Structure formats: structure tokens, C-alpha cells
Curated annotation (Swiss-Prot):
Keywords: Decarboxylase, Lyase, Pyrimidine biosynthesis. It comes from Bacillus cereus (strain ATCC 14579 / DSM 31 / CCUG 7414 / JCM 2152 / NBRC 15305 / NCIMB 9373 / NCTC 2599 / NRRL B-3711). The active site is at K61. Pathway: Pyrimidine metabolism; UMP biosynthesis via de novo pathway; UMP from orotate: step 2/2. The gene is pyrF. Catalyzes the decarboxylation of orotidine 5'-monophosphate (OMP) to uridine 5'-monophosphate (UMP). Signal peptide: none annotated. NCBIfam families: PRK00230.1 (NF001273), pyrF (TIGR01740). It is an enzyme of class 4 (lyase). This is Orotidine 5'-phosphate decarboxylase. InterPro entries: Aldolase_TIM (IPR013785), OMPdecase (IPR014732), OMPdecase_AS (IPR018089), OMPdecase_bac (IPR047596), OMPdeCOase_dom (IPR001754), RibuloseP-bd_barrel (IPR011060). It catalyses: orotidine 5'-phosphate + H(+) = UMP + CO2. Belongs to the OMP decarboxylase family. Type 1 subfamily.
Amino acid sequence: MSQSLIVALDFPGKQEVEQFLHHFEGEELFVKVGMELFYKEGPAIITYLKEKGHKIFLDLKLHDIPNTVKSAMRSLASLDVDMVNVHAAGGSSMMKAAIEGLEEGKQEGKERPICIAVTQLTSTSEAMMKKEIGIEKTLEEAVAHYAKLTKESGLDGVVCSTLEVPKLREVCGNEFVTVTPGIRLASDDVNDQVRVATPKRARELGSSYIVVGRSITKAENPLEAYKTVKQQWEGVTV
């Protein structure tokens, strides 16, 4: 199964995670652990998932003063997760400090986790960004600005919507990682996200990774839903 397809484990606790992963016995997934699950279960949930052979994107979106973020990243790297993130709005000094913390905390003999920055949440519309956040640029311009700053700060890539990926390829190059949430099958509700796309569209626009939650986790048959998403994402029959 594809390692560029990340399944969002947006569950309240370990019991629900176990029930969900029962559908994937013997498979090694790339999963996302967010705030709700990590704050409830703590580092033990990371240990559990690593023992199952899964890769982990720990999605905590750190945003604080540089020294605090550096210390936090040092701790997160020691958990042997595969990907972490910060908010690009925290600035260059904070992002550089995040990398320093990851380098200091990584396990011996292993590479540091991939570190990406959130540009704008996929729940943010351009009108909201201008009115409530006070950024007068277009949404694409704001995302491109943050992405360029992220790259200059030494991070590996950004979280963004699929719609911004082509512009970021122009600004930051093809090696720059783009992780795109807001992925839905055409038959699904968009829920609380504004900038959404299908797996096929994400592939066409050039996303590096896609993050898929409810389309898989809320499906009657999660494994079949996963295979459907994978087929659309990779453009192959599974």
C-alpha cells in the first residue's frame, strides 16, 4: 500500500483506533495522529502504532517562541515519528529552531523526522483570511509567501490545499514536499473544509502526500474505501 497516502486517525482514543486498524491487519500504513488522539493517549499511542509497523505523521502544529518549539521538537523526535509540523506564521526563527530540536532529539542512526509547515488551514477561505486574520494578499499569494519562507528556513515542505500545489512547485521547486489534506471522494460531504479535492485531482495537481480521514475512517468498509482512494491517487488498479 502507498506510503504517500496518509490516513488521518481522527479518533477520540486508542479503543477506536484499535477497532479501525483491525480492518488493516498485516498492512503497514502511514497514519496521522492529531491533537485529539495525542492529547488523550499521550506518547503511548505512538509506541503502539510503531509496534504495529505504521509510519506516523504527528500533527500538532506547533506555534510558540523559538526556544519552546525547539525543546518540544527535541521531545517529539525522540518518539521516532516520521513527520511533524509547525505553523509557518511562527516565523523563520521558530522554524529554524524546530529543525535544531529535531536534529538534537532524533534517535541514533536515524534521520530526523520530515518537518513541514502549515500555510493556511484548509478551513480558511480567502474572505476569512482577509477579514479575520488581516492578510490582504490573495490566498495563493499568502500560501506562496509562507512556503518560500518555510523553504528558506530549512524545512522540507508545507501543508497546503491541492489548489496551491502548482504555484508552490513554481516558487519552491519539485523537491519541496506538499502535504495536502481536504481530500474527499466525489461522493462525500466536504464537512468543515473549504478547499477540497478528490485523490485523482490531487495527483493531477502534483501533491507529494495526501491526507484522507472521513472518506476512509467513516466508511462502512474502511479497507475497500482505502483501496478506492489509493486507486484514484495512484492511477492504478489495486
